Regions:
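Helix-loop-helix junctions that connect adjacent transmembrane segments
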Residues: 7, 41, 121-126, 151-289, ...
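TM-loop-TM module centered on a large, flexible mid-protein loop between adjacent transmembrane helices
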Residues: 74-75, 81, 235-301, 320-369
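Helix-loop-helix connectors at the membrane interface of multi-pass transporters/channels
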Residues: 77, 104-127, 163, 221-225, ...
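Membrane-interface loop-to-helix entry segments
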Residues: 111, 128-180, 210, 233-238, ...
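Transmembrane helix-loop boundary segments of multi-pass membrane transporters
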Residues: 31-42, 115-124, 147-156, 347-379, ...
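Hydrophobic transmembrane alpha-helices that form the core helical bundles
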Residues: 56-60, 68-135, 140, 296-310, ...
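Membrane-interface "cap" regions at the ends of multi-pass membrane proteins
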Residues: 1-41, 45, 51-59, 65-67, ...
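C-terminal membrane-solvent junction of multi-pass transporters and transport-like membrane proteins
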Residues: 5, 327-330, 374-425
Length: 481
């Protein structure tokens, strides 16, 4: 991006981008189902102690790579070299595969609310079969161009934000007016128990507070530079944390936590709100269902093609075959997108075998999505730790405090993420075969494949090129400048 186009995003614009990237009403539902009102303080703690420092970590990487439109691959390569950069970029794409398994059933459920006014209850097998068909359709549409996707998604995202704020205001007003909440709001209910099961669910909280990697890339584009960026990120983190916490406190004003479903929980709470205020419940269900369905279907189309395109465009040529990464007339690697489809199929089928209901199925896939989502930030944190330990002399306009501060902050984050990852990968009460073949097996197979592919690529390089690829890119750039 040219300098003339830099410094064009105002503080409010960055605040809006941050909110859109991070906040989701469905995250409130998911965590309320699992840990109830204890999610309220945990959301706030996650945004303060994870989202804000992680944003600052990425902002430092962007500052280090200021002459490039940096992505995950470039950030990690600048500190750890090519192999770990490839593994990190690969995990971002790999996490997306698990994300589909939790997104697809929701799209189906909200379609039911939109067109029927209620959720048509499906078995896990039927849910998986419909998800396969829906994903095939989404892959076809996204690889053949979807020009109206952007405007539609923008409108529905705005409507979802409006609905969320409306619910908070109306539920808060009802509470102030003397309504007894369906689940009592007490200090005892909000105190976390920090059991192994609870630690596993904290990954859901961290996943909900994610999005820093899509926001921090704008550090060079904000009016006022890095100082303004830091101020806005801190304000945004506090605002999002407070909003998540308030929404979590009010989510059970009209509906009991144990009656909420992962697939249609958003509609359920609005149905309860409609019943309290005497509004037509069926119309409310259809409206919220339609908005949610449109927003999630748009998200499905976007995430079907975009991560594939980004991943295969930023990694070195030669790791994958030319036909795999070849772009079609719409600028999408269609063959790679269909390979992605074939990989997701078993990820949807395997948890179905150990699930008695669609709710059980969703619990399994959301848990694994949350566990897998810990890996990419973990690699970035390890790269940052190496940057502050061994490469802190490299010039950059922005640093997250002193060397000691940076090392201390990222070390705490690495410890928290490591425990959360283990707790969610080995959840209490889960089927042991599901854990071995799905949770552990999926990660081992996918990361093992990435390691093998990079070994083959490295073997094709000359000794000089191999040594250069292994060295931190920021160090190489400094030596050649």
């Amino acid at each position: 991006m040219s300098d003339s186009k830099r410094n064009t995003i105002g503080k409010f614009g960055l605040l809006s981008l941050t909110f859109a990237a991070v906040f989701s009403f469905n995250n409130v539902i998911n965590n309320n189902i699992e840990i109830g009102l204890a999610s309220a303080p945990m959301f706030f703690l996650a945004t303060i102690f994870y989202f804000i420092p992680f944003c600052l970590i990425i902002a430092e990487f962007v500052s280090l790579n200021k002459n490039s439109e940096a992505g995950v691959y470039a950030w990690v390569k600048s500190s750890l070299g090519g192999r770990w950069a490839f593994i990190s970029a690969y995990t971002y794409w790999f996490v997306n595969l698990f994300f589909f398994t939790s997104l697809l059933p929701r799209v189906i459920a909200y379609a039911s609310y939109a067109f029927l006014g209620y959720e048509y209850i499906l078995t896990p097998v039927a849910t998986t079969a419909l998800s396969m068909v829906l994903f095939a359709f989404a892959t076809y549409v996204s690889t053949n161009g979807a020009k109206m996707l952007g405007p539609i998604t923008s409108v529905t995202s705005s409507l979802m934000l409006l609905l969320t704020l409306s619910y908070i205001l109306l539920a808060g007003a009802a509470l102030v007016g003397g309504v007894q909440p369906a689940d009592p709001i007490t200090v005892e209910a909000m105190v976390p128990d920090f059991s192994w099961a609870f630690l596993g669910i904290t990954t859901w909280i961290f996943m909900a507070a994610g999005g820093a990697e899509s926001v921090a890339v704008y550090v060079n584009d904000v009016k006022g530079g890095s100082k303004s960026f830091v101020k806005v990120i801190i304000v945004a983190g506090i605002f999002i944390g407070v909003l998540y916490s308030i929404a979590s406190l009010l989510i059970n004003v009209f509906v009991h936590s144990d009656t909420l479903k992962y697939t249609g929980g958003s509609v359920q709470v609005f149905e309860g709100l409609a019943a309290h205020f005497g509004l037509p419940e069926i119309l409310m269900n259809r409206f919220v269902g339609l908005v949610s369905f449109t927003a999630m279907f748009g998200s499905l189309l976007m995430w079907t093609a975009t991560p594939v395109k980004i991943f295969f465009s930023e990694i070195p040529a030669g790791i994958f075959g030319k036909k795999t990464v070849e772009l079609n007339e719409n600028g999408v690697p269609a063959r790679a997108a269909w390979i992605q489809y074939l990989i997701v199929l078993p990820l949807m089928v395997i948890p179905t075998l150990g699930s008695n209901t669609a709710q059980d199925l969703m619990n399994t896939v959301i848990n694994m999505t949350a566990a897998a989502s810990m890996l990419p930030p973990l690699f970035i944190m390890l790269a940052y730790l190496n940057l502050r330990l061994k490469l802190d002399h490299l010039p950059r306009e922005f640093k997250m405090g002193s060397r000691t501060t940076g090392i201390a902050v990222v070390s705490v984050l690495i410890a928290i993420f490591s425990v959360g990852f283990l707790a969610s990968t080995f959840p209490t009460g889960a089927d042991i075969l599901t854990i071995i073949f799905y949770n552990v097996g999926g990660i081992v197979i996918f990361l093992g494949f990435a390691w093998w592919k990079y070994n083959r690529y490295e073997a094709s390089l000359s000794a000089e090129a191999r040594a250069k690829e292994a060295e931190p890119a920021a160090q190489v750039a400094m030596q050649t400048s």
